[in-house]
Amino acid sequence: MGTRCLLVLLLVLLVLKCEVQGDDMARQDEATGPTLLSQMQESLYGYWGSAKAAAQDLYEKTYLTAMDEKIRDMYSTSTAAVRIYTGILTDQILSMLTGDP
């Protein structure tokens, strides 16, 4: 029984020693510089910013006021038509539910 206790004690001490060394190495790695994840995030944010700026420039170069007015006019006429037909449909449903001829 004494040898088993000694063996368990040595094993526990070995595990604790490895854990302490691993903790010191982790602290040294953190102190050396930014992590790989933060470097990747910075890189992706840079790419996203440049793509966003390029898209904004392209939009500003191709912006046509006449086309914008046509789109706004088409939108207003289509929404007016949808409003009319929605009103008709609502009246029909209400008349069916109330039983009015």
Swiss-Prot record:
Cite the post-translational modification comment.
Answer: Proapolipoprotein C-II is synthesized as a sialic acid containing glycoprotein which is subsequently desialylated prior to its proteolytic processing. Proapolipoprotein C-II, the major form found in plasma undergoes proteolytic cleavage of its N-terminal hexapeptide to generate the mature form apolipoprotein C-II, which occurs as the minor form in plasma.
- Excised during maturation, the propeptide residues are 23-28
* GO molecular function annotation: lipase inhibitor activity; lipid binding; lipoprotein lipase activator activity; phospholipase activator activity; phospholipase binding
Presence of the UniProt keyword Transcription in the record: no
Q: Does the keyword Disulfide bond apply?
A: no
Which parts of the sequence are annotated with region: Lipid binding? 66-74
InterPro entries attached here?
A: Apo-CII (IPR008019), ApoC-II_dom_sf (IPR023121)
Query: Where's it mainly located?
Result: secreted
Report which residue ranges the record marks as coiled coil: none
In this chain, the stretch annotated as Lipoprotein lipase cofactor covers 78-101
Instruction: Please state the span of the N-terminal signal peptide per the UniProt entry.
Output: 1-22
Where can this protein be found? Secreted
Task: Kindly list the GO CC terms recorded for this protein.
Answer: chylomicron; intermediate-density lipoprotein particle; low-density lipoprotein particle; spherical high-density lipoprotein particle; very-low-density lipoprotein particle
A GO term (biological process) for this protein?
Answer: phospholipid efflux
Give the protein's function.
Component of chylomicrons, very low-density lipoproteins (VLDL), low-density lipoproteins (LDL), and high-density lipoproteins (HDL) in plasma. Plays an important role in lipoprotein metabolism as an activator of lipoprotein lipase, the enzyme which hydrolyzes the triacylglycerols on chylomicrons and VLDL.
* Record-stated family: Belongs to the apolipoprotein C2 family.
Q: Which PANTHER family match?
A: APOLIPOPROTEIN C-II
Q: What is this protein called in UniProt?
A: Apolipoprotein C-II
Organism the protein comes from: Panthera tigris altaica
